[in-house]
């Protein structure tokens, strides 16, 4: 039973050993309150940093969110999606009781579906390093088409929420939480970091990328005007010129979307110009 639960493994010599030895163990509990697995974290710099229970008859990591059993009891419908167990634990200790995280995997469609059942808003609170930012971008794409409002947390002066809360305290984190970015703002902020805006060529490259992001996003004409103003202010390029290029890009994106839709209809054999002959027999 211990082997099938994933708590122990058998060595090459046939001896059983504890796979979580020298680690802090974190119980993973399902929404009904049953312990179904464990995560184990080292307390030094040894690798791997985390070890998780293998999948069993009752534990499917792609369908499980750590601490959802606690978060679902909260009156708040704003969930905070973290990168690791320790971030979640720190948040709960500080009173943010809707913090959850995936269990040793990247976010999965099944976990997104779980969130839609309990949350109205999801704040992505991943690490501030490059890997965390890439994970944020991947996760944002997975929420496309859901009814959830998604925001992105920027953690200044710390590598993750756990470090930020321990360094600056709960109130500072609450203030940061209230200043989250929309997915569009996150993408634009990520784009501008890639360019030296003092360089003419890079400034134009940034404008092209930013306009591509805006043209591919479902935003109102008013919002496009606001973002065009920000791009103009960042780059020193006339706002009217930015708007002209943006409107051209929006029209181009619309044409491409219509062509893609028509091609898909044609592929399925139900394009508007296809008619099935009437069989008089």
Mark where each language-model region is.
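Phosphate-handling DNA/RNA-contact segment within nucleic-acid enzymes
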Residues: 1-118, 122, 135-136
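A charged alpha-helical hairpin associated with nucleic-acid processing machineries
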Residues: 30-32, 71-79, 106-122, 127-281
């Amino acid at each position: 039973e211990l082997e099938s639960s994933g708590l122990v493994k058998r060595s090459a010599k046939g001896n059983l050993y504890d796979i979580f030895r020298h680690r802090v163990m974190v119980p993973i509990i399902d929404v009904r309150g049953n312990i179904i697995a464990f995560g184990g974290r080292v307390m030094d710099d040894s690798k791997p940093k985390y070890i998780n229970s293998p999948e069993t008859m009752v534990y499917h990591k792609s369908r499980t969110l750590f601490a959802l059993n606690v978060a679902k009891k909260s009156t708040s419908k704003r969930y905070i999606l973290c990168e690791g167990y320790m971030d979640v634990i720190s948040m709960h200790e500080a009173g943010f009781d809707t913090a959850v995280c995936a269990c040793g995997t990247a976010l999965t469609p099944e976990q997104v579906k779980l969130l839609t059942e309990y949350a109205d808003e999801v704040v992505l609170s991943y690490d501030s390093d490059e890997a965390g930012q890439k994970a944020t971008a991947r996760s944002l794409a997975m929420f496309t088409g859901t009814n959830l409002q998604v925001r992105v947390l920027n953690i200044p002066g710390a590598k993750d929420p756990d470090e930020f809360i321990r360094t600056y305290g709960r109130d500072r984190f609450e203030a940061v939480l209230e200043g989250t970015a929309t997915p569009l703002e996150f993408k634009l902020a990520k784009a501008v970091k890639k360019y030296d805006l003092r360089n003419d060529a890079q400034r134009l490259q940034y404008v092209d990328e930013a306009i591509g992001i805006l043209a591919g996003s479902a935003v109102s004409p008013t919002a496009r005007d606001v973002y065009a103003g920000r791009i103009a202010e960042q780059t020193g390029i006339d706002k009217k010129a930015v708007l002209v290029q943006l409107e051209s890009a929006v029209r181009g994106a619309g044409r491409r979307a219509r062509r893609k839709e028509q091609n898909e209809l044609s592929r399925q054999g139900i394009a508007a110009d296809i008619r099935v002959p009437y069989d008089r027999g």
